[in-house]
């Protein structure tokens, strides 16, 4: 199985300025992400950034980075530019690992790539784990996904789906026993042909209402398959508290 890992790393961040360059045990966060990705089965790991400072930081630690335009509306648009710059063929597979995931498990990267390889009818693969509890089911910041028997995604939503009618009658807020409710994990594998088409896809109503980019692909008829894992991976770094947690994790490993 051959695939490339691309790590989009945008320097601007409202909650954590210069996030890709934040120090984690002596190295920039984006370098820590690249190190984790390099432990997967990827043939190549490449950082895609909008700032020369990130590119230089990667080079200083022996990692490749490509400089992309600063005006991309989404990380997926940035990937589209990167695959063209790298000259990847349409049938190649790219795994998108976010630049704020310094605790990503290499095995999860491999599993998502393998899920796409096993589904030639699909353009995208992603990942999900069982919902932890009723609080997660009703939390709009926890994205839910429902799947067909063949692991094809039927819908992603911030709403509590599937809706257990009887268990939730009368306003109850419970996680019904046996409910096939999955917590979406934002790691993606793409076929390069899809990434090249993505910038031309118009944003649909579902994406606008839910604010979920993956719905754009589904609204345009593209198939997403979902790898199921038993437990949620470590969360990414979005806040100063998240950064301290990641630093502590690395300190404990050293």
From Swiss-Prot:
- So what EC number does this one have? 2.7.7.38
* Localization of this protein: Cytoplasm
Which CDD domains does the record match to this protein?
Answer: CMP-KDO-Synthetase
Task: Note the superkingdom of the native organism.
Answer: Bacteria
Name of the top EC class for this enzyme: transferase
Its recorded reaction(s) are: 3-deoxy-alpha-D-manno-oct-2-ulosonate + CTP = CMP-3-deoxy-beta-D-manno-octulosonate + diphosphate
Q: Does the keyword Nucleotidyltransferase apply?
A: yes
The alphabetized UniProt keywords are: Cytoplasm, Lipopolysaccharide biosynthesis, Nucleotidyltransferase, Transferase
Main location as per UniProt: cytoplasm
Instruction: Give one GO term, molecular function aspect.
Output: 3-deoxy-manno-octulosonate cytidylyltransferase activity
GO BP term (any one):
CMP-keto-3-deoxy-D-manno-octulosonic acid biosynthetic process
One GO CC term of this entry? cytosol
Q: Is Transferase there in the keyword field?
A: yes
Q: In which pathway does it act?
A: Nucleotide-sugar biosynthesis; CMP-3-deoxy-D-manno-octulosonate biosynthesis; CMP-3-deoxy-D-manno-octulosonate from 3-deoxy-D-manno-octulosonate and CTP: step 1/1; Bacterial outer membrane biogenesis; lipopolysaccharide biosynthesis
Function as written in the Swiss-Prot or TrEMBL entry: Activates KDO (a required 8-carbon sugar) for incorporation into bacterial lipopolysaccharide in Gram-negative bacteria.
According to its UniProt record, which protein family does this protein belong to? Answer: Belongs to the KdsB family.
Q: What is this protein called?
A: 3-deoxy-manno-octulosonate cytidylyltransferase
Q: What is the lineage of its organism?
A: Bacteria, Pseudomonadati, Pseudomonadota, Betaproteobacteria, Burkholderiales
Q: Which gene encodes it?
A: kdsB
């Amino acid at each position: 199985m051959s695939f490339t890992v691309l790590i989009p790393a945008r320097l601007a961040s409202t909650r954590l300025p210069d996030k890709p360059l934040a120090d984690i045990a002596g190295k920039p966060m984006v370098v820590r992400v690249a190190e984790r990705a390099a432990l997967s089965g990827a043939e190549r790991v490449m950082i895609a950034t909008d700032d020369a400072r990130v590119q230089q930081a990667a080079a200083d630690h022996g990692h490749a980075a490509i400089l992309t335009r600063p005006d991309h509306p989404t990380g997926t648009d940035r990937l589209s530019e990167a695959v063209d710059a790298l000259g990847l063929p349409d049938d190649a597979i790219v795994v998108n690992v976010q630049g704020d995931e310094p605790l990503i498990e290499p095995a999860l990267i491999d599993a998502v790539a393998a899920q796409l390889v096993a589904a030639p009818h699909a353009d995208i693969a992603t990942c999900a784990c069982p919902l932890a509890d009723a609080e997660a089911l009703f939390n709009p910041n926890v994205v839910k996904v429902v799947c067909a028997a063949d692991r094809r995604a039927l819908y992603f939503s911030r709403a509590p789906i599937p809706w257990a009618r009887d268990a939730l009658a009368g306003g109850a807020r419970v996680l019904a026993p046996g409910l096939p409710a999955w917590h979406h994990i934002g790691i993606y594998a793409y076929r390069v042909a899809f990434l090249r088409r993505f910038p031309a896809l118009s944003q649909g109503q579902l994406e606008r209402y839910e604010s979920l980019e993956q719905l754009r692909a589904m609204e345009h008829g593209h198939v997403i398959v979902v790898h199921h894992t038993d437990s949620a991976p470590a969360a990414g770094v979005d806040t100063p508290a998240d950064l301290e947690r990641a630093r502590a994790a690395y300190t404990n490993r050293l």
